[in-house]
């Protein structure tokens, strides 16, 4: 009997111990789940996350950052500072808390204190976006262009949201010669964000001429732009009436071009995104037109359904006043004289300067030739191949394997 009593007492004690351990484990599990949930929602609902895990310095730091935003009141900033200090006691490496203290110090006008705080922030991490933004503004305020661009570079390499926020600011500054020169040096190092920036500025820069000067300087450094970026910038310059800037930039991409001559006379360029100064397919729906490359050069092939006509191929020109010869060679053109395709040169505002008919290819071995006179009041021109509607069942078909516009005597 005494043995059974002792066994019973031990069993009761053991069960009490096990119950206490189970309760403790459940409590720890609840804390763990609560912390995991808090960390998962730290960006979407930082206040709720902080209430679930007020001991987590990283979450406390994020709450301090939210309270110190651009629209924060004086009371908000006091609360943010208190949370930031608490966060650093909980986690001395909580960089957002350091940035909060630095920003609020700057807002109060304590610039030297802000610089000291942000220096510490940069020692902890180069990835904090608010630290980078402050550093950019501080460098700009001191006239330190290289320093500002260094921080742009760091921010753009370390933050996924940086391009959306910083590209518009950066392109607005390229009208300044010193900024543009420094930016060229930065882009010449080929940063990871360089191609994305070039594509962005080609279509979005507020000053297309400044963008052209930037791209020309990059060309001199061996930094080529994509066909799409080149085409976008040339189009912007031309639509803005800046023909000379457009041609200067185009000639930096294509050294040796002569404004008195059309380009790519044998269709060998093989461009995916041609600029206005290159050959462009301009046919309407239903018209089949392609530029194809072969072993002996390229060829322009076209097929137009019956009763349909219109432009097929076009290239923008910047010809000086004078007389010009258009000459070329066709293959497979076999139309009645009244429906033969023809080349037309017209001024930018639409005034026609003349036509050169493409005769049947069996005539003169496919050669065609004609003249245009460009007057002084026609600063920009468009050379276009036109198809005329025909009642023939086969429609209008043919190929052009060579065409050249040149001044008389050249």
Describe every region a protein language model picked out:
Residues 5, 14-43, 161, 184, ...:
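Extracellular and organelle-lumenal recognition/adhesion modules and their flexible linkers in secreted
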Residues 38-46, 71-83, 108-117, 143-147, ...:
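Structural signature of tandem alpha-helical TPR/SEL1-like repeats
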Residues 49, 86-87, 120-121, 155, ...:
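Canonical positions in the second alpha-helix
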Residues 52, 90, 124, 158-159, ...:
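Structural marker of alpha-solenoid helical repeat scaffolds
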Residues 59, 97, 131, 165-166, ...:
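TPR alpha-solenoid repeat register
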Residues 62-68, 100-101, 134-135, 166-170, ...:
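Structural register within alpha-helical repeat arrays
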Residues 67, 105, 139, 173-174, ...:
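Residue at a conserved register position within TPR or TPR-like alpha-solenoid repeats
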């Amino acid at each position: 009997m005494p043995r059974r009593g002792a066994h019973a007492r031990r069993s009761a004690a053991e069960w009490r111990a096990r119950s206490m351990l189970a309760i403790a484990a459940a409590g720890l599990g609840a804390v763990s789940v609560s912390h995991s949930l808090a960390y998962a929602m730290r960006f979407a609902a930082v206040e709720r996350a902080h209430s679930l895990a007020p001991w987590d310095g990283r979450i406390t730091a994020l709450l301090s950052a939210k309270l110190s935003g651009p629209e924060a009141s004086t009371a908000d900033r006091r609360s943010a500072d208190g949370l930031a200090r608490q966060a650093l006691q909980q986690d001395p490496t909580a960089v957002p808390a350091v940035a909060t203290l630095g920003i609020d110090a700057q807002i109060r006008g304590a610039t030297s204190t802000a610089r000291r705080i942000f220096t510490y922030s940069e020692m902890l991490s180069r990835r904090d976006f608010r630290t980078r933004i402050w550093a950019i503004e501080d460098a700009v305020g001191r006239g330190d262009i290289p320093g500002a661009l260094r921080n742009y570079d760091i921010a753009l390499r370390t933050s996924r949201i940086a391009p959306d926020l910083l590209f518009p600011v950066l392109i607005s500054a390229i009208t300044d010669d010193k900024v543009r020169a420094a930016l060229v040096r930065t882009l010449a190092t080929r940063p990871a964000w360089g191609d994305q920036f070039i594509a962005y500025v080609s279509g979005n820069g507020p000053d297309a001429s400044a963008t052209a000067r930037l791209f020309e300087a990059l060309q001199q450094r061996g930094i080529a732009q994509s066909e799409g970026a080149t085409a976008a910038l040339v189009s912007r310059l031309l639509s803005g009436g800046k023909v000379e800037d457009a041609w200067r930039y185009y000639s930096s991409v294509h050294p040796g071009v002569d404004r008195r001559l059309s380009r790519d006379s044998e269709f060998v360029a093989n461009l995916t995104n041609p600029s206005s100064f290159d050959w462009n397919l301009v046919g309407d729906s239903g018209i089949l037109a392609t530029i194809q490359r072969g072993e002996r050069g390229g060829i322009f092939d076209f097929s137009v359904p019956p009763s349909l006509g219109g432009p097929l191929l076009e290239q923008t020109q910047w010809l000086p006043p004078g007389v010009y010869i258009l000459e070329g060679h066709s293959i497979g053109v076999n139309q009645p004289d009244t429906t033969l395709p023809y080349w037309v040169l017209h001024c930018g505002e639409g005034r026609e300067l003349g036509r050169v008919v493409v005769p049947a290819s069996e005539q003169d071995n496919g050669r065609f030739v004609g003249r245009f006179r460009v007057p002084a009041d026609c600063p920009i021109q468009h050379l276009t191949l036109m198809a005329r509607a025909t009642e023939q069942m086969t429609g209008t078909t043919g190929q052009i394997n060579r065409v050249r516009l040149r001044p008389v005597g050249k």
